[in-house]
């Protein structure tokens, strides 16, 4: 036998002996381990500062995963002596004041985010009056389960904020008690361009949620003069280009002066129901623009203050453009096609789309009247069709009116005649 064979044989014998030893000794070792007492698992230490007395009754499951996991119970709760043997503290503890020791420093870069601003908000003022329905810190942020705002599981993460606000603002008892004009803001928001962007397109980091418009801790009531939710500058944070146009328009300049007569963004686009102009039901859709503008321009008491005739909407509706829009023509010009959208200016302003020098360009756009003679643009646009207007327009209007009546009458007479003749015909077997 060669030396190599001898070595291999020796290795095989050693491996076999080792395997036999394992098979014989393993059951004995396992049995010994089973009979050996297992030491008790050490109890999980209580969070820092939490007394054993608290843990005897209260679990820490939710607190352990929150931003306040390292805090002690007494950091938030004022522990009063108990009145009986079963409860080591008073049955009802004083409400927690989050701004007493921790959240009291103002946020200098974004004052609205400062929890201290809550005291002057519509919720904080209600709390001072003793109102029991107003939102406290924990109603929005949670109680022991508070998580960072950027955590998707946080109740105040951007995607969850509309639902949190709806707990109160879609509660009809609260709405009626405090005369809140928006009865179903959450349902309206969910159907708006903002709500669809958040929940259908996943744009919670970009599309507006409640706090972007109304504020965070500094939420104001309806009666506030400079209410954030109606301020065009609020919309301008997301729509800076549009706000820049609006700011230089006749409406924007007056709005920034505090003039309450001029339309703000929400007056034309809506509040929680903001929809795309392509949506047929939107107040800014092609067909609905005249009705939206009439909210101001058909009110004599407002128009009189600024020397503007209050018949502008009516005369437009009676014009060829207005009639075509009423019949569903989506390509016909409406108010915004001629006057502008966010850049509306008085007709005497050289930058206005309806300034005399700019009408050829405005009316001659592709899709409207390209190549139209400049002389035609000098004609009056909002022309009265009655006796107060021009004689030519009045005569044409009357001719067309009587022609329409005649055609309608002839159609009715012919229909009745044919129906009578049909009934008189003998029935064929």
Model features per residue range: what roles?
Residues 3, 25-429:
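Short sequence/structural segments immediately N-terminal
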Residues 14-26:
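Bacterial N-terminal signal peptides
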Residues 2-17:
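Bacterial N-terminal signal peptides that target proteins for export
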């Amino acid at each position: 036998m060669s030396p190599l064979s001898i070595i291999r044989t020796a290795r095989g014998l050693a491996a076999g002996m080792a395997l036999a030893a394992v098979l014989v000794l393993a059951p004995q070792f396992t049995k010994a381990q089973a009979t050996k007492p297992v030491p008790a698992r050490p109890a999980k230490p209580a969070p820092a500062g939490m007394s054993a007395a608290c843990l005897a009754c209260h679990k820490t499951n939710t607190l352990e995963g929150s931003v306040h996991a390292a805090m002690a119970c007494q950091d938030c709760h004022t522990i009063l002596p108990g009145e009986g043997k079963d409860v080591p503290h008073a049955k009802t503890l004083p409400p927690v004041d989050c701004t007493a020791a921790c959240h009291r420093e103002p946020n200098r870069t974004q004052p609205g985010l400062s929890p201290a601003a809550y005291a002057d908000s519509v919720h904080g003022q209600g709390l001072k009056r003793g109102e029991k329905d107003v939102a406290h810190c924990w109603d929005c942020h949670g109680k022991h389960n508070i998580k960072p705002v950027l955590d998707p599981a946080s109740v105040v993460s951007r995607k969850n904020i509309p639902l949190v606000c709806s707990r109160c603002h879609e509660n009809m008892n609260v709405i009626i008690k405090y005369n809140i004009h928006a009865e179903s803001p959450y349902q309206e928001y969910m159907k708006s361009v903002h709500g669809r962007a958040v929940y259908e397109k996943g744009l919670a980091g970009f599309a507006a949620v409640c706090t972007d418009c109304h504020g965070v801790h500094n939420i104001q009531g309806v009666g506030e003069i400079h209410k954030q939710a109606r301020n065009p500058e609020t919309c301008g944070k997301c729509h800076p280009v549009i706000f820049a146009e609006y700011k230089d328009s006749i409406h924007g300049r007056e709005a920034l002066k505090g003039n309450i007569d001029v339309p703000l963004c929400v007056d034309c686009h809506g509040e929680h129901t903001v929809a795309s102009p392509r949506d047929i039901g939107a107040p800014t859709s092609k067909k609905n623009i005249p009705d939206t503008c009439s909210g101001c321009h058909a009110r004599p008491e407002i128009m009189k203050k600024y020397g503007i005739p209050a018949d502008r909407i009516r005369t437009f509706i009676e014009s060829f453009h207005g009639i075509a829009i009423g019949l569903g023509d989506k390509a016909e010009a409406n108010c915004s096609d001629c006057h502008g959208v966010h850049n509306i200016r008085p007709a005497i302003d050289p930058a206005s789309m309806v300034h005399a020098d700019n009408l050829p360009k405005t009316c001659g756009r592709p899709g409207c009247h390209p190549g139209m003679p400049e002389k035609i643009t000098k004609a009056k646009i909002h022309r009265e069709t009655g006796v107060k207007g021009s004689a030519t327009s009045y005569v044409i209007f009357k001719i067309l009116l009587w022609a329409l009546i005649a055609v309608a009458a002839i159609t009715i007479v012919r229909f009745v005649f044919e129906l009578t003749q049909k009934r008189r015909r003998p029935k064929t077997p």
